[in-house]
From Swiss-Prot:
Keywords: Cell outer membrane, Membrane, Signal. This is LPS-assembly protein LptD. Together with LptE, is involved in the assembly of lipopolysaccharide (LPS) at the surface of the outer membrane. It comes from the Bacteria. Belongs to the LptD family. It comes from Marinobacter nauticus (strain ATCC 700491 / DSM 11845 / VT8) (Marinobacter aquaeolei). One of its GO terms (biological process) is Gram-negative-bacterium-type cell outer membrane assembly. It holds the Pfam family LptD. PANTHER family: LPS-ASSEMBLY PROTEIN, LPS-ASSEMBLY PROTEIN LPTD. GO terms for cellular component: cell outer membrane; transporter complex. Component of the lipopolysaccharide transport and assembly complex. Interacts with LptE and LptA.
Length: 794
């Protein structure tokens, strides 16, 4: 028998496959849909001024507003998504209702439906109890966990949870992806199928860019979308067409084309266009194939493969061009085939054990400057190949590795090429015995180089064993420390092709060191900020009785350390193991720190020190490294952090004999709290190397949306610019654009140029390579990029 309710009371129903329960309750909720219907995005969009302060504070300044998801439950609480929708009862309410037993329920006026995490509102609804199908007339609004849908009418299955909407709009809150469609099917909680649809991450009414397609499927569970017959539109004008694409809607990986990369470089003879294709082969390995056309050179391909295991990650990168026409023209006799390979691996085995490997090889010395765009190979004269394992424990460490090089420029003489270590084994350990501390540092190396065309010491290869046992008496207190120690620096050689005597010989150097420091502090204040000021004097004495003439020993891996403040507390002025410096010297140094007692931050540190030599240093490395000075240059360091966003670092070597600065390095770094403003000012000076350069870099917002980017490097000795970078960046809340012009110095001391672009569509990634070059040039830019886009959340 039909039943109906026509008063202003609300009929509220709880429906299941077994029974229908009807209850009456008062309703004070306004019906949706009067007048023109807002889209899903318009419903949840809030201007910046209407957002909660904590949400607005997370928005970038170039965003005018953001989305605030509404509540799912009618009582203001989000309905938990427990269970399968079809197994949960349907709750319904309306201003009027007519019910036919075991047949149909008709609802009219402010209809509200809820089944588990699914909720919808509309003007009218018909529910067929036999089939479980529900027809809803709009304007309707459907809300669930992380999404909002609107439309003119819909069909909903209470058994499967599928919702089909005509003339629909939608919003995915997590990715801020919105759109519209002639029809939309919510197949499941996480899957949406769209016909004749449009999607974008721009705000409501702002279709700066959009993807328009005949069919679009969004899978939130998998994190990607697929589309057919796709147009990329900019300001409603089509600019690109794909018959089929897949695209990410979150940070997860998905096989498909990435966005094109393009730019211009005089090194590449003009413009280039790249179309990367990403292969998500398995959860633990993937690959990226990047074919690219370079004007003047031809088709060039780069491939990157990544493999992730329970122990670590391995990356293989390849570059190949079959026929580089520009290279062939510049190098008669070459066929134009060029290639490069770079492999890196890192592994952690547990228990303190780890492994690593690096291998790089290129076809010719100009490859890196002409072609390299993505391989992680630095421009260098020698490419290192190294692989080994290491162990770090509480009181000991061990490492063994193989190490070799590819010398890139053919013009480098054989005598200047580095030796390979095949292998090198390092062991060190320490133990405490009462007041004493015993330690050992040891190293075994087999050195090899192709010396067939060399003579004398340069022709030698062979083995070297070095061991330094030490016995120390460390004494520590809150007010200071003292550490006297004695050690023996022992080296044994077994050489091949050695012509100056017995090929097996050793060297023993007795060493005494005594390091002492005191600590004083006092409380003070500056501008009503309490500080703790320290005064830390330090005395370090070193004595090493090394034989003065060690030039009968080949130079396998030895160099002379650059003298800086930290060198004040090293007894040996040589790196490597083929020379042990003689020493009889005393270092006097003083450090003072200013620590903010409110935050614990070190606001200032100043250090100064000098070495007093009691004897001439006679050990040299084939004419370099010996000296008869009685005092070293005065070495100083200054670090200032007056505020969290400003830092000044400066180091200085001043020669009291010549009263001139030997070396100086200074860098001033500033960034605003949100990293929108970046500024660096650097100066480097070296009198021995005849080097003086000034470096200025900045990212400066011209408006909330437009920023200027620049860097300039000037060499005073060459009296010329040696590097520039200038560009503009535009940001709004749905896309950004960068254009950068860069000059850089090549090996032949000529300025090369390149023009780089980058376009990023929020939520879909970017194309172009400008950002990487800016990050390499300007300190803090990586952090700025990380913060550039923000999503409001409650």
């Amino acid at each position: 028998m039909p039943s109906h309710c026509s008063s202003l009371l609300c009929a509220r129903f709880r429906l299941s496959s077994l029974a229908v329960i009807v209850a009456l309750a008062a309703s004070g909720v306004r019906a949706e849909g009067a007048g023109s219907s807002p889209s899903a995005a318009e419903i949840d969009w809030r201007p910046r001024s209407e957002l909660p302060p904590e949400v607005a504070g997370r928005l970038p300044v170039f965003c005018e507003g953001g989305y605030l998801p509404g509540t799912v439950g009618g009582d203001g609480a989000v309905v938990p998504g427990e269970g399968i929708e079809g197994s949960m009862p349907l709750e319904a309410s309306a201003l009027n209702a007519r019910y036919e037993l075991d047949s149909e329920l008709y609802l009219q006026g402010d209809v509200r439906l809820r089944q588990g995490p699914f909720q919808a509102t509309g003007a009218e609804a018909r529910y067929n109890q036999q089939s479980g199908e529900l027809q809803l007339q709009g304007p309707l609004v459907s809300r669930g966990e992380g999404f909002l849908l609107t439309g003119q009418d819909a069909n909903y299955s209470t058994q499967s949870g599928q919702l089909d909407i005509n003339t629909a709009t939608f919003l995915l809150h997590e990715s801020e992806l919105r759109g519209e469609a002639s029809s939309l099917s919510r197949v499941s909680e996480s899957q949406v199928v769209i016909s004749d649809g449009m999607i974008t991450t721009c705000g409501p009414g702002q279709n700066d860019w959009s993807i328009v397609a005949s069919d679009i499927e969004l899978d939130q569970a998998e994190g990607f979308g697929t589309a057919r017959h796709v147009r990329l539109e900019v300001l409603d004008a089509p600019v690109f067409y794909w018959p089929y694409i897949t695209f990410p809607i979150d940070d997860r990986r998905k096989t498909g084309f990435l966005y094109p990369q393009f730019g211009s470089s005089s090194a590449g003879s003009g413009a280039y266009l790249a179309l990367p294709y990403y292969l998500n082969l398995a959860p633990h390995y993937d690959a990226t194939l990047t074919p690219q056309y370079i004007h003047g050179r031809g088709l060039f391909t780069e491939v990157e493969g990544r493999y992730l295991s329970q122990y670590g990650e391995s990356v293989l990168q390849l570059g190949y061009i079959d026929n580089d026409s520009a290279f062939r023209d510049e190098n008669p006799g070459e066929n134009g085939e060029r290639w490069a390979l770079d492999f890196t691996t890192r592994a952690a085995f547990g228990g303190g054990w780890s492994g690593y490997g690096d291998y790089s090889v290129i076809s010719d010395e100009d490859y890196l400057s002409d072609l390299n765009r993505s391989l992680e190979i630095d421009q260098a004269t020698h490419l290192q190949r190294r692989g080994g394992v290491r162990y770090y424990g509480a009181n000991q460490y061990f490492e063994t590795y193989l190490n070799g090089y590819q010398t890139i420029p053919d013009r480098i003489a054989d005598v200047d090429k580095p030796y390979a270590q095949l292998p090198e084994v390092i062991y060190g350990g320490s133990l405490e015995a009462g007041w004493l501390e015993a330690s050992l540092e040891s190293q075994y190396t087999w050195f090899y180089r192709d010396n067939e065309n060399l003579t004398g010491l340069d022709k030698a290869n062979g083995q070297r064993l070095r061991a330094i046992p030490e016995l120390a008496l460390p004494m520590r207190a809150l007010w200071g420390f003292s550490r006297p120690s004695v050690s023996l620096d022992y080296t044994r050689y077994e050489l091949d092709d050695y012509t100056l005597g017995d090929a097996g010989f050793d060297r023993t150097v007795p060493v005494f060191e005594w390091d002492n420091g005191l600590y004083f502090d006092r409380r003070s204040s500056l501008f009503d900020v309490p500080y703790n000021q320290t005064l830390e004097p330090r005395l370090y004495y070193a004595w090493a009785d090394a034989e003065s003439d060690q030039n009968y020993i080949p130079d396998f891996d030895t160099g002379i350390r650059s003298f800086r403040f930290d060198q004040l507390f090293r007894r040996d002025r040589f790196t490597g193991g083929d020379r042990v410096g003689d020493a009889n010297q005393l270092t006097v140094a003083l450090t003072s720190r200013f620590n903010d007692l409110l935050t614990g931050a070190e606001r200032a540190r100043v250090s100064v020190g000098q070495v007093r030599y009691f004897e001439d240093r006679e050990v040299d490395l084939f004419g370099e490294g010996a000296s008869d000075r009685s005092r070293s240059p005065l070495a100083g360091e200054l670090v200032l952090n007056p505020i969290d966003n400003l830092e000044l670092r400066s180091s200085l070597l001043w020669d009291h004999e010549t009263r001139k600065t030997e070396e100086g390095r200074s860098q001033l770094i500033f960034h605003s709290e949100d990293y929108r403003y970046l500024a660096t000012l650097g100066h480097t000076y070296s009198r021995p190397d005849e080097l003086e350069q000034t470096d200025i870099g900045t990212v400066f917002p011209v408006t909330d949306q437009v920023s200027a980017i620049g860097r300039w490097v000037w060499d005073s000795e060459l009296d010329r610019t040696v590097g520039t970078l200038a560009g503009l960046e535009y940001n709004n809340c749905c896309w950004s654009f960068q254009v950068v012009h860069q000059n850089y110095l090549t090996d032949d001391e000529e300025l090369d140029t390149r023009l780089l672009f980058r376009i990023e569509l929020k939520g879909l990634g970017g194309s172009g390579g400008a950002s990487d070059n800016i990050a390499d040039a300007i300190y803090g830019y990586d952090e700025r990029e990380r913060r550039r886009f923000g999503n409001p959340r409650r």
